Amino acid sequence: MQTQNAPETAENQQTDSELGRHLLTARGFHWIYGTSGDPYALTLRAESDDPALLTRRIREAGTPLWQSTTGAWVTGRHGVAAEALADPRLALRHADLPGPQRHVFSDAWSNPQLCHIIPLDRAFLHASDADHTRWARSASAVLGSAGGAPAEGVREHAGRVHREAADRTGDSFDLMADYSRPVATEAAAELLGVPAAQRERFAATCLALGVALDAALCPQPLAVTRRLTEAVEDVRALVGDLVEARRTQPGDDLLSAVLHAGSSAASAGQDALAVGVLTAVVGVEVTAGLINNTLESLLTRPVQWARLGENPELAAGAVEEALRFAPPVRLESRIAAEDLTLGGQDLPAGAQVVVHVGAANRDPEAFLAPDHFDLDRPAGQGQLSLSGPHTALFGAFARLQAETAVRTLRERRPVLAPAGAVLRRMRSPVLGAVLRFPLTTSA
């Protein structure tokens, strides 16, 4: 696998004027549809509207599955959401669109498609279920599988990185900038075996990739979109070089594991590239988000934070409850591969189905006192976070990092407390991404 110049992707072929017009048109439709009060369209605006109110409105709509003015079929009910996420007929891409998942607004008023704002195929975000299943199987020895834990080496590295990060914090620090993102990025770099000389480049690339999951559904500013597409090509080149090196010098890293799990050299190399790219695109952001959301849920409830000091074993339950209460990925979008019936509605092939995971995870029909963050909530109640194909790949890894963060900060910074409000990124309906969360270690 030789590193090559970035190919002419759909975005690279467009002038700034063309791409900017495309993004503004999609953004305009979200605003127009939102004027009717459509809660999903307002969610996609991701501006100043109350996300908790919109989440409740999506869940409490008149029917379990309803059609938004955007054209998408939306559900916030737990039963329908679980059914949709488990249905193999609902895929990440259009069955009749074999190339990049991109829709041009040539006659947008007739039937605008807002399911793939920009194509992210080169980031492997629109791959098939079969591909994701194969990648998960080949990566499981290192990343862990559903219900399983990551490799012991991954656990040992997590403990060391989190201790070092906690010890670097002063009397006040920002959770995202000074802790969550650095440890998530460093953990991902270690997974891939990124050389020390390349880690600064890797961190900068991951930062630009952080908007990817949001950009699929919510148009980002032109400059941000350009940086994203450039970062995708940069991480492909970086990971491609690592994969080539592992062919002759394998190690105990994730890429080596995937290479040696493949049935052929060609397919194994492509699988390793995909898993490596997804680690940077999805793994880092989901992990950083889960760390932030778990600690925010605990630190804004001092009694719960104090309980962790008395019983550190509650850390795993705190992470699982945070996945339900404040999921790091709020929206999951799918495309019907064939005509099907879901939630009492007949959907044609090509229809977009959106699961609002945050709404479904607070469905009172599935959870007792769903708006209460409960460290003692029984496990196995069916929270739906990290059940998408690419997010599930990093489920065990993200849980490990978040649990380690909780344990480490509770031990080393026991009087940790918020020093201001959480500031979230605009245009982040999928992740609800945190920009800043100031903390103080002084009583």
UniProtKB/Swiss-Prot annotation:
CDD domains linked: AknT-like
Superkingdom of the organism of origin: Bacteria
Disulfide bonds: none
Entry-linked SUPFAM superfamilies: Cytochrome P450
GO biological process, one term: antibiotic biosynthetic process
Family matches, as Pfam families: p450
Physiological role: Involved in the biosynthesis of the anthracycline antitumor agent aclacinomycin A. AknT is required for the glycosylation of aklavinone aglycone by AknS to yield aclacinomycin T (rhodosaminyl-aklavinone).
PANTHER family according to UniProt: P450, PUTATIVE (EUROFUNG)-RELATED (PTHR46696:SF6)
Family: Belongs to the cytochrome P450 family.
Name of the protein in question: Protein AknT
